[in-house]
Amino acid sequence: MDKGFYNEASAHRLGWEASWFIPGHTEYDAKLTKAIRVFQRAHGLSADGMCGPSTYRRLIADRDQHKEYTCFENKDYSDCIYYAGQPIPIEWDKVITHLDDNALKMTGKKKTVTGKKRKVKYFVTHWDVCLNSESCVRVLNRRNLSVQFCIDNDGTIYQLCDMNDIAYHAGGSHNPNCVGVEISNAYYPKYQNWYKRNGFGERPLVTDGTVHGSSMEPFMDFYPVQKEALKALYKACHIGLGIPLEAPKTKWGVDPEVRKKTFRGFCSHFHLTRGKIDCAGLDIEAILEQIRED
């Protein structure tokens, strides 16, 4: 593959520039390819010299950490989420839906289902490798992707589209069967200072994470308030959509039932494919057990 051609096409599609890797550089040449490799090695990525989706997400997080961040103080929250236009109560005090004036605007690809309720079999949990939910939605829009929910650093749940809409977040044939959430977490411990500087505090670290049979280097965990928000979202989707309070039988790897789309319940992205590691360290069964005990 011509890497220069690939990078130029990627830049036009996603909106990045050669100068983001080399100040003042404008060419999509071998020098840029080398600079992308250096960036990829520094971020634990496959160093192929091509700025694909994974490299782009890390690039955005790197650039965003140097920008001034203003935490939006909202005073008007919803007490429900929406499925086929109908409100579903949720036991959480910070919810902003796609119908609210202060919604995060998602423009990525999605499919609107009309005339009937689609059957949602399972709920897919992601981390976004972004510094905040606004940045996550920006990346999704540039990549022409979508998801039903985001959970921000302070626990705010954003609904980005109706749960009856098919969003593009889990890959191909999984999307019509599920809804999903992107939980804000830049993943790499190098971003801890950004969180502390902007008033969120230091993130917990996962130091014993494993996925697909391999041990992981220490990475940042979700804040406790994000896990509480996730629990509230799981519970609302269980009650409103009838998704069973079940976790995959395979705890830290691809689950055969999830992969074959016969599973019904709550799972992580890595349960679908070996190509994903999110959300390693998230004990879904423990969250579901708390809901059962409520």
Which sequence ranges carry the predicted segments?
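Beta-sheet entry/capping signal
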Residues: 21, 122, 148, 264-265
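Active-site-adjacent loop/helix surface patches within enzyme catalytic domains
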Residues: 92-239, 243
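Structured segments of extracytoplasmic/periplasmic soluble domains
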Residues: 35-46, 58-65, 139, 184-187, ...
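Catalytic-site microenvironment of enzymes
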Residues: 2, 9-10, 42, 67, ...
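Catalytic phosphate/metal-binding cores of nucleic-acid and nucleotide-processing enzymes, i.e., regions
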Residues: 89
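Basic/polar, cationic surfaces and motifs that engage anionic cell-wall
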Residues: 62, 70-84, 191-294
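Short acidic, glycine/serine/threonine-rich helix-capping segments at coil-helix boundaries
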Residues: 1-62
